[in-house]
């Protein structure tokens, strides 16, 4: 299969993934979606990007220990990846017109690079301005992405965002998120072997 091809199998994976997200009590769901060759091509593209150090604290005193490229250029492999996701979401929206409150346009793109031993990013919610769906794709490394019930980390649930998986988070406008205030609290820690991840959002 060509890289980032929208195959019938992928459409089924996305349909099932969004159905699982809609019924998830934690507002997050991850599932296998990308091939090793696709992940490798994204890693290669990410290695060419310019990074800057993220602020050590953001929002509600959320700790941050990583380098970031933002806004990252949606070009080449990144654009092919985003286009694949947009077309898959469009298919699902066509089947279920009330799934999202608008067609998905992934116009907010960031790449994050966590060094080995990083403290990660503290528990936080994505900003309200991000609509419908948040896509996180880990490309390399060993770390823990988790959802928690509160900012103290109670009720923690680790999510398998291994390279090749697509992690979806519910955002305002998604049918499965009844209350925008209940956007999932999440964070990243236990950066045992570094972490390289990309995030697509609809701003």
Predicted regions: what they are:
Residues 4-99:
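Non-heme Fe(II)/2-oxoglutarate
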Residues 6, 105, 131, 139, ...:
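A short, structural micro-pattern
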Residues 20-22, 101, 127, 136, ...:
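A general structural signal for short secondary-structure junctions and capping/turn motifs
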Residues 30-32, 138, 168, 199:
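Short, well-ordered beta-strand micro-motif
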Residues 33-38, 115, 127, 141-143, ...:
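A broadly conserved detector of short glycine/acidic/proline-rich loop/turn motifs that flank catalytic sites
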Residues 62-144:
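Conserved double-stranded beta-helix
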Residues 146-203:
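Catalytic core of Fe(II)/2-oxoglutarate
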